[in-house]
Amino acid sequence: MPRLDDHLWRGPCAKGTKHRSHPRASARGLVAKAGEMINSSGSGPSLLAAHGALGTDPAHGPQSAGVGGQGSSSHVNSWHHHLVQRSLVLFSVGVVLALVLNLLQVQRNVTLFPDEVIATIFSSAWWVPPCCGTAAAVVGLLYPCIDSHLGEPHKFKREWASVMRCVAVFVGINHASAKLDFANNVQLSLTLAALSLGLWWTFDRSRSGLGLGITIAFLATLITQLLVYNGVYQYTSPDFLYIRSWLPCIFFSGGVTVGNIGRQLAMGVPEKPHSD
């Protein structure tokens, strides 16, 4: 038979031991939690480093590079597309101006084509419009390119109405060269030179435009002299090395006019991408 006093004695002792062991367990839990906090604080930088390594993982690098490459490729394609469009427009403008102005010169008997030339492949001077169209495309693309290279974007009268007025003045200068009669060619040349400089001052006023206009006038005059010297065609009453002395003025004003057209076409066109 169990003894009652033993049961009563063991009961409080057991409860006491339980109450004494519970604070020990709680103390151990606090120590464990403190250790976990220390471990977590120590492993934080390593986790950040791991995330950083993941962000710079070479596997992700090609993906971002591929996206950038696609954007650059589309930008290049867009730039080339605009370049082709501008070239075609400038070529067409050069062909039309050549047809109109050459017809005007021929009607006024300023330009004469010998019979032996007309009887050959140069019949009706079919080569003049394509050559003028090609020259117009080159000049029209060169003007905005020089502006971009010099870091001086042309902002003077950048609207199509001004460009069309410039074209009208250029045609008027060419018409005056064929129709006006002066006492001598020097007066005519000085008058056309003043009109050409007035065209540049009215519609351009840029140093690059003036320099390119003078360069174009010199090169075009030299090429024309070579063609006339080889008998491809000739001018009536030549007064300056087989040609007319006012011809450089026509080339100068034509370069300024085509340059303004090229600048206007270049507005809103994305810049050429630069490869590092």
UniProtKB/Swiss-Prot annotation:
Belongs to the INSIG family. Residues 1-83, 144-158, 204-208, 263-276 are cytoplasmic. Its main location: endoplasmic reticulum. GO terms for cellular component: endoplasmic reticulum; SREBP-SCAP-Insig complex. Oxysterol-binding protein that mediates feedback control of cholesterol synthesis by controlling both endoplasmic reticulum to Golgi transport of SCAP and degradation of HMGCR. Acts as a negative regulator of cholesterol biosynthesis by mediating the retention of the SCAP-SREBP complex in the endoplasmic reticulum, thereby blocking the processing of sterol regulatory element-binding proteins (SREBPs) SREBF1/SREBP1 and SREBF2/SREBP2. Binds oxysterol, including 25-hydroxycholesterol, regulating interaction with SCAP and retention of the SCAP-SREBP complex in the endoplasmic reticulum. The keyword Transmembrane applies. The record marks F170 as: Required for the recognition of 25-hydroxycholesterol. GO terms for molecular function: oxysterol binding. The chain crosses the membrane at residues 84-106, 126-143, 159-181, 185-203, 209-230, 245-262. It comes from Bos taurus. Phosphorylation at Ser-206 by PCK1 reduces binding to oxysterol, disrupting the interaction between INSIG1 and SCAP, thereby promoting nuclear translocation of SREBP proteins (SREBF1/SREBP1 or SREBF2/SREBP2) and subsequent transcription of downstream lipogenesis-related genes. Residues 107-125, 182-184, 231-244 are extracellular. It is found in: Endoplasmic reticulum membrane. A motif (KxHxx) lies at residues 270-276. Residues 16-25 have a biased composition (Basic residues). Residues 1-26, 49-73 are annotated as: Disordered. Interacts with SCAP; interaction is direct and only takes place in the presence of sterols; it prevents interaction between SCAP and the coat protein complex II (COPII). Associates with the SCAP-SREBP complex (composed of SCAP and SREBF1/SREBP1 or SREBF2/SREBP2); association is mediated via its interaction with SCAP and only takes place in the presence of sterols. Interaction with SCAP is mutually exclusive with PAQR3. There is a cross-link at K155, K157 (Glycyl lysine isopeptide (Lys-Gly) (interchain with G-Cter in ubiquitin)). It is a multi-pass membrane protein. Pfam families: INSIG. The modification Phosphoserine is found at S206. GO terms for biological process: cellular response to insulin stimulus; cholesterol biosynthetic process; SREBP signaling pathway; SREBP-SCAP complex retention in endoplasmic reticulum. InterPro entries: INSIG_fam. The KxHxx motif mediates association with the coatomer complex. Binds oxysterols in a pocket within their transmembrane domains and interacts with SCAP via transmembrane domains 3 and 4. This is Insulin-induced gene 1 protein.
